[in-house]
Amino acid sequence: MYAKLIFKNAKRSVKDYLIYIVTMTLCVTLFYAFLSISSTHYHPTIGAEYNISLLAGGMKLAICGISLLLLFLIHYVNRFMLRKKQKEFAVEATLGMEQKTIGLLFFGETFFLLIFSVSVGILLGMVVSQVITAMLLASFGEPYAFSWSFFPDTVLLTVGFFVVCQILVGVGNVRILNKSRIIELMTANRQNEKPLHKSRWMPMICIFYGILLLWMLEVGTVKYHFYFDSRHPLPVKLMYWGNVLFPALTLLWAIAGAVLHRKIGFSRYLCGLLAGAVLTAIPIFSIAELEKAYFLGFDAPTLNQYLLFGVADILFIISAVIYLSNAALLYWKESKVSRKYHNTSLFLFGQLSSKLATNTKTMTIICVTLTFSICLFVIAPVLTGWSLGYLDSRAVYDIQISSRYNDVYEVENLPDTDYGEITAFIEQNNIAIKEDLTFSEYLPQKSDFYQRVKYDFPPLAIALKDYNAVRKMLGYEPITLQTDEFATHWHRAAEDKDIENYIAKHTLLETDAGTLKLSENAVFQEPVGESIYNLYTDVVYIIPDEIAQVLLPVQSNRFVMTQYPLPFKTAEMLEQLLGRSYPEDPDKDNLAGYSTTVHTTEVNRIIALNFILKASLIYGAIVLMVMCLTVLALQQLLDAEKNNYRFSVLRKMGVEEKDLHTLVLKQLGVWFGMPITAAIVVAIIVIGYFLQSVSAEISAYIGCGALMVQVGIIIGILFLLLICYFISTWILFKRSISEN
């Protein structure tokens, strides 16, 4: 009997459950689609040199971890449905049904609809998974062909995940209904909330921000004491002063405002804190750029600490802006009587002000989450494009190995090897070789061998014949030099202004074999690999062969190009052999370390990690975006249910249906527009700062044009999602207030 009642109630209330069905179906679709490539039954055609098993485990962990956020969304949607049906539950309880039974029936309804949503979501996920497969094949450079596939293990994982989530949420709903009194269920929609000025949300945030300011002041003072130098350039001095002065002044205002809050008023007090927070953020976010430009010597924990301060400062700014925007709405309403009583403005202001306390908290959380989502959407193509672009520079040769002398402190211990293990492996496995080059790199002066100051290592030099051999391997034209000339080869990420400044200061090169002058054609920047550069340098000197014979060889390299790509298993065996024979970090001191790269395994590793990163960021951004827009929509639809009577009164007073729809549009415009606008503004600032900090890498590895195309696509997707949610909410809101 109960099963029939559950089915009948679900069928009768399908309109009420529509938002629940759509949300759950969308969540299941995304979950199945992104998780499908981790299935043990997933075997795309990508060639013998690739192996996707590297990304299956990481993909499963990343997607399942991010999907825990869906537990909150499922909980919120269930609570929305619970509130929506409170009157119905009260009537059933009044007629004699036990509240425990009511709770179980509600759980049965939601569980039945969950199974329906999961079924539809898996079918849609099979279609969407083709998009994920196309992304994966594009990452490996393989063509995409549609193939309908079904993965039983992914289906079981999807069903299990959402069933467990629904059971956890459903048990909570049953407990809530058991503890609720009938009168509470009957009158829940009539309860008023506290006015905005009595909300404790913002005062608590101010207290936490005051504690943060004290911490920032302490850190800024310590860094000033240990790192400040009067010889620093003016921008660095301003940064040090700002990291002490602005937190101190803001903290002083916070203390004074707390003491004199009755005279000042909370809104003025918060305006002062907001101004201080903006000023405090300026020197904090300048640290990374100044560290990059002037090598200030801040260690990673210090930079991470200031990053934490910057993020916390932004969160406070968002909270303050949302609160002050709502306070400004109330002030604007009361500032002029004619404005308040113009047409239906009084009703609109009443609608907005009645939920300011709750909505301020919700809008703040949504704004922060939405900002994070937008940042993830934009940062995803930057990070993944950077990673793939860097791969083109790192894994240039099929096999490459280079020694490093930075841990060798005696010239006698410098390695002198031709890497014979590679030769033996090639012969043993019958690998066809296209090009094979072994060469050394030198220090211009032997005294430079003992120079080990970080960021001040000397550039290496390469003989002209070896440099031209490298260029030939990569398909570049050879270069020529006079016997008394030298040229330079620069890292792909080096900026033009840095190259020009360096060349202007280094027109002569002092070597142990004499002085060389700069060639007329002295700058080359084609990608030739990462290993030819010394630590913390972006340039290599190209010198005549006769000069190189006199200099001290400190780095030994071997680059091999094969006729055909190495199979993955063969490449893995070679990588393990090189790791044993030429360790990156030798156990003994005063021995050289080695950097080895096998193209096949490196490409597999980087593409796998890159795809996991890209998929995780996009999936996380979509989940957060859906959560924010769903919460916004549900909040307004819940208000529509509560305020149905108010709109019916306006209708009876003669207000036309067109004007009522305009009121709805204005109300939705405020509650949708406020957090979204704030999130977009903050995201633009954060993303602008991030793009500026990695501008050199973007130019070198991605290209501004390609990045703008990707960002444009992302903006279009975000705008489409927003429009769909806004229009859907508007239509459902109008339908809700028109029912009676």
Q: What is each residue range found by the language model?
A:
Residues 391-611:
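Nucleotide-cofactor and metal-assisted catalytic machinery
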Residues 51-68, 140-168, 195-208, 234-248, ...:
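Conserved transmembrane alpha-helices of multi-pass membrane proteins
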Residues 1-29, 196-207, 263-265, 269-272, ...:
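N-terminal Sec/SRP start-transfer signal
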Residues 29-61, 135, 371-397, 610, ...:
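Alpha-helical transmembrane segments
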Residues 5-16, 72-112, 189-196, 630-669:
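Interfacial "coupling" helices/loops that link adjacent transmembrane helices in transporter permeases
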Residues 29-40, 76-80, 113-142, 154-179, ...:
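Small-residue-rich transmembrane alpha-helices
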Residues 15-22, 33-65, 83, 232-249, ...:
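Peri-transmembrane interface segments
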Residues 14-20, 106-124, 159, 163, ...:
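Selective transmembrane-helix segments that form parts of the transport pathway or gating/packing helices
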